[in-house]
């Protein structure tokens, strides 16, 4: 007999599942007999409990298990027979009207939508490009020098000098201070510290605090007022005015290493050749620029695909992805050391919009890949693994690391598929190239 699939909406469907009671009862009896071989009850040896007593004890539980299994099996059979592409998990409910010879259940579920992708030639994508020159290399060298800064006491002679005759604290100096803060003459938590170090000009402290420390020499003190911002993270003091006294304990000036052979060696250039060092920095920056431009253009391509695509999104898939995002958020909290992160009360609703976009995009990409043969080829995956491995000290070990784990390899395969989609769309869309600086590129990729 043909199965009647009711259309309840755009994607929602319902089908009736009928299970002959005789068939169900046979399975219940078989399971109870099997269960009886191991059941333990007071006064009976294992396996010797009368079958009637086992049935009285476990019949309800076994019946529920059998019905659940049979319903699932029958639904699978029907969905295959009717070519139903079921999205998510179906829900089952007993029908109000039951016959004497069969159990009847309604299975309610959603199906995957038809995905209509519009004309790719109408899609508009802006592709960022950047050129790595001497200015970008010099800026990187400056950052690397600052990462290797050494501090020396002002006024004390050493191998790098004494930092000048002026021993007062200046911007860029590392200072060590004691401070006491009070509000209405009462000390408050976090308002007092001893031997507290920070670098002037880095913005770690509030502006009024840094300004008060500027110009002080070791042993000098200064009293000043400081108004905490209204949005200050310490709610007890936010918006309030405190009186601080800061005492300078130590003033140290920064010494940046010279860009010489020793500096190059510290960056891994064995012979200390400065030209090699600059060339390696350039190659690293170009790899980073490529990675960032790819990420930005990928987001633009995905946005463009969503704009020209028409489809209904199964609610079941959105709900599943919401739960997935909740678990990811909890894992992130756990990695940050938050106590009881796995039980954090994170509402799934906060991920509704993000989940809908992710599911919709996944359906569009699946359709595009299938229709245009954009699956990842083994040689493409290997090329991406090799490219990724180049930025590490031992590329061969990184390659082995990838190929030793199917999950890692699957992640790279997904990356290649996305790259294939991006290249395919760029070959058909209206693409505008835009030259941007490396700094602007970094800022844009951070916001993407």
Curated annotation (Swiss-Prot):
Protein name according to UniProt: Trigger factor
Domain PPIase FKBP-type: 172-257
Entry-linked PROSITE patterns: FKBP_PPIASE
Upper taxonomic lineage: Bacteria, Pseudomonadati, Pseudomonadota, Betaproteobacteria, Burkholderiales
Enzyme class: isomerase
Keywords, in A-Z order: Cell cycle, Cell division, Chaperone, Cytoplasm, Isomerase, Rotamase
EC number annotated for this UniProt entry: 5.2.1.8
Transmembrane segments: none
């Amino acid at each position: 007999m043909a199965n009647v699939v009711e259309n309840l909406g755009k994607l929602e469907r319902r089908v009736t599942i009928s299970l002959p009671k005789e068939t169900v009862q046979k399975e219940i009896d078989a399971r109870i007999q099997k269960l009886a071989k191991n059941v333990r009850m007071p006064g009976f040896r294992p396996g010797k409990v009368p079958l009637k007593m086992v049935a009285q004890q476990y019949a309800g539980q076994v019946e529920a298990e059998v019905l659940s299994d049979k319903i699932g099996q029958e639904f699978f059979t029907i969905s295959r027979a009717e070519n139903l592409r079921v999205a998510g998990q179906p829900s089952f409910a007993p029908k109000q009207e039951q016959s004497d010879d069969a159990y009847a259940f309604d299975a309610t579920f959603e199906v995957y939508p038809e995905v209509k992708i519009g004309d790719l030639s109408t899609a508009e994508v802006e592709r960022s490009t950047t050129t790595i020159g001497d200015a970008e290399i010099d800026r990187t060298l400056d950052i690397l020098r600052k990462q290797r800064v050494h501090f020396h006491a002002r006024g004390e002679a050493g191998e790098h000098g004494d930092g000048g005759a002026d021993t007062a604290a200046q911007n860029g100096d590392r200072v060590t201070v004691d401070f006491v803060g009070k509000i209405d003459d009462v000390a408050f938590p976090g308002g007092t510290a001893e031997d507290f170090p920070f670098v002037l000009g880095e913005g770690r402290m509030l502006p009024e605090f840094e300004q008060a420390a500027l110009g002080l020499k070791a042993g000098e003190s200064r009293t000043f007022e400081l108004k905490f911002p209204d949005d200050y993270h310490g709610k007890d003091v936010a918006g309030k005015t405190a009186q601080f006294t800061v005492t300078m304990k130590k003033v140290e000036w920064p010494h940046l290493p010279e860009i010489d052979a020793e500096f190059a060696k510290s960056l891994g250039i064995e012979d200390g050749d400065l030209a090699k060092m600059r060339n390696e920095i350039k190659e690293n920056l170009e790899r980073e620029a490529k990675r960032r431009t790819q990420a930005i253009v990928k987001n633009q391509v995905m946005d463009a695909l969503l704009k020209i695509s028409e489809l209904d999104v199964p609610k079941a898939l959105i709900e599943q992805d919401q739960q997935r995002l909740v678990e990811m958020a909890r894992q992130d909290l756990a990695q940050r050391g938050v106590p009881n992160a796995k039980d954090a009360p994170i509402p799934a609703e906060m991920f509704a919009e993000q989940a809908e976009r992710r599911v919709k995009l996944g359906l569009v990409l699946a359709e595009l890949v299938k229709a245009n043969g954009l699956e990842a080829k083994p040689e493409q995956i290997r090329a991406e693994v090799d490219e990724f491995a180049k930025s590490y000290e031992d590329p061969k070990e990184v390659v082995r690391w990838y190929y030793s784990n199917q999950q890692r390899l699957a992640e790279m395969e997904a990356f290649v598929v996305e790259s294939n989609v991006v290249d395919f769309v760029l070959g058909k869309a209206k693409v505008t190239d835009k030259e941007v600086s490396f700094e602007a590129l970094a800022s844009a990729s951070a916001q993407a």
